[in-house]
């Protein structure tokens, strides 16, 4: 079998040296991706296309599908390459190939020709089109908007009968641009923004700020692995997970409510910039869209950018949510995003939409930056190829209950402000307060002979924290959902 790879048009308008470099990189990317399907396949580059030849017919569909997801490819032609002698021979071969497709349909013939011949492309179109029209009674020629277009390519003494055309994702080959670090949360925005930078030729590494235990991290790892495996598997990339719970706890304890959102984002950018510098990455990528939430106003984004010299790319800055969700659906991350737990631990009651630099800096003076340095230093860095094996490992489960036993105690893990606003009172059972950001250090001080039922309003944080405690060896925890 043979495929002809057509280049993304923006590649073809580059200077000769740049075009050759892009084609060389794309050829290498294709080899890296397809070697898993057929180690004997051949990938041959030309000035205006790339040929892929493979022997294993059982892998035809898999190879074709993989090619449509490699950045830099405009479209793929599945072809049959045969010799020919003259125009009548071309017609006879086209008749055998296309007769069944043209029965009862309107059609036209389009020919591309390279080499020296005693006929032109138009001559072949007329001859083959007239012959097909005569020999297939139910078919008729229609040059504009036909139901079937017969594509033929003539190159020297070879005829390419095009059996199918399949659209690629376009863009530039990965590796033609410099590396970036995507701040991925597993939601709609960060997945789409990561894809857009891969499509533009960047090798995308991933940085995840873990705010809620292993279950959340496993979900985000699956999203990152899916994106890499589907669109970027030609290159090795890193997945860096940073345990940000200590940072969140420090913010909740010391920072003014209205400034929390902006300061949390500033801390994330600081941490991600340190990671980027460590690995020689040139830019950060976020899924922020202008005005989508309070921290994404121009004033706040400018303040967030100010904490780092690292370039921050926001490919979705002018996109609305519906457009982003549609893109997520196209690339296959929508289902991941819909089921991803939404972290609700740092939500200000009255977040500022126009933060003042002096106020932000004054609040940050209360923050212990050694905590930030420590979590970055302890960041977990893994090769994304290892994630598939790791996520297959059994995840600790936690029981959810809606009633009480004689030894049970409800543990309200909401922030102090939330508890003061809406105190939890349940008849017939004790309620103890311990904010989620103190669980890792204070839960061990509680009476371990009791069974602790973790509770928060949405049930997301309580489940994540219960999973975390189970992983730490505390088996006396459950989730309370009335």
Curated annotation (Swiss-Prot):
Residues 61-165 form the THUMP domain. It comes from the Bacteria. ATP binds at residues 183-184, 265, 287, 296. The keyword Aminoacyl-tRNA synthetase does not apply. Pfam families: ThiI (PF02568), ThiI_fer (PF22025), THUMP (PF02926). It catalyses: [ThiI sulfur-carrier protein]-S-sulfanyl-L-cysteine + a uridine in tRNA + 2 reduced [2Fe-2S]-[ferredoxin] + ATP + H(+) = [ThiI sulfur-carrier protein]-L-cysteine + a 4-thiouridine in tRNA + 2 oxidized [2Fe-2S]-[ferredoxin] + AMP + diphosphate; [ThiS sulfur-carrier protein]-C-terminal Gly-Gly-AMP + S-sulfanyl-L-cysteinyl-[cysteine desulfurase] + AH2 = [ThiS sulfur-carrier protein]-C-terminal-Gly-aminoethanethioate + L-cysteinyl-[cysteine desulfurase] + A + AMP + 2 H(+). This is tRNA sulfurtransferase.
């Amino acid at each position: 079998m043979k495929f002809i790879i057509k280049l993304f048009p923006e590649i073809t308008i580059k200077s000769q040296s740049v075009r050759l470099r892009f084609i060389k990189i794309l050829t290498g990317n294709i080899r890296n991706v397809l070697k898993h399907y057929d180690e004997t396949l051949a990938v041959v580059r030309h000035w205006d296309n790339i040929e892929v030849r493979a022997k294993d017919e059982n892998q035809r569909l898999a190879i074709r599908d993989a090619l449509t997801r490699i950045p830099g490819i405009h479209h793929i032609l599945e072809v049959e390459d045969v010799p020919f002698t003259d125009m009548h021979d071309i017609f006879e071969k086209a008749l055998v190939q296309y007769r069944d497709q043209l029965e009862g349909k309107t059609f036209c013939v389009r020919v591309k020709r390279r080499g020296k011949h005693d006929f032109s492309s138009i001559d072949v179109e007329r001859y083959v089109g007239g012959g097909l029209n005569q020999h297939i009674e139910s078919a008729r020629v229609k040059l504009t908007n036909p139901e079937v277009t017969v594509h033929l390519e003539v190159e020297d003494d070879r005829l390419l009968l095009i059996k199918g055309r399949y659209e690629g994702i376009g863009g530039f080959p990965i590796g033609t641009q410099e590396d970036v670090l995507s701040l991925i949360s597993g939601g709609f925005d960060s997945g789409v923004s990561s894809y857009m930078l891969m499509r533009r030729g960047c090798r995308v590494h991933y940085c995840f700020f873990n705010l809620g235990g292993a279950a959340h991290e496993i979900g985000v790892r699956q999203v990152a692995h899916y994106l890499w495996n589907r669109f970027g598997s030609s290159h090795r990339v890193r997945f860096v997970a940073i345990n940000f719970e200590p940072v969140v706890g420090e913010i909740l304890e010391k920072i003014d409510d209205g400034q929390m959102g902006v300061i949390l984002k500033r801390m994330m950018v600081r941490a991600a910039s340190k990671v980027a510098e460590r690995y020689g990455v040139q830019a950060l990528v976020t899924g922020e869209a202008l005005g989508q939430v309070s921290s994404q106003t121009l004033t706040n984004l400018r303040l967030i950018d100010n904490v780092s010299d690292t370039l921050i790319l926001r490919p979705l800055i002018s996109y609305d949510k519906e457009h982003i969700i549609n893109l997520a659906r196209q690339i296959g991350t929508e289902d991941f995003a819909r089921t991803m737990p939404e972290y609700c631990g740092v939500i200000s009651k009255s977040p500022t939409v126009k933060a003042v630099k002096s106020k932000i800096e004054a609040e940050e003076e209360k923050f212990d930056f050694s905590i930030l340095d420590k979590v970055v230093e302890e960041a977990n860095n893994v090769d994304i190829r290892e994630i598939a094996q790791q996520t297959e490992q059994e995840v600790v489960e936690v029981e959810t209950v809606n009633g009480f036993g004689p030894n049970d105690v409800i543990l309200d893990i909401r922030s102090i402000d939330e508890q003061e606003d809406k105190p939890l009172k349940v008849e017939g059972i004790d309620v103890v307060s311990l904010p989620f950001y103190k669980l890792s250090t204070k839960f061990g001080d509680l009476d371990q002979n009791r069974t602790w039922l973790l509770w928060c309003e949405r049930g997301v944080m309580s489940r994540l924290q219960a999973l975390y405690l189970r992983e730490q060896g505390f088996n006396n925890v459950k989730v309370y959902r009335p």
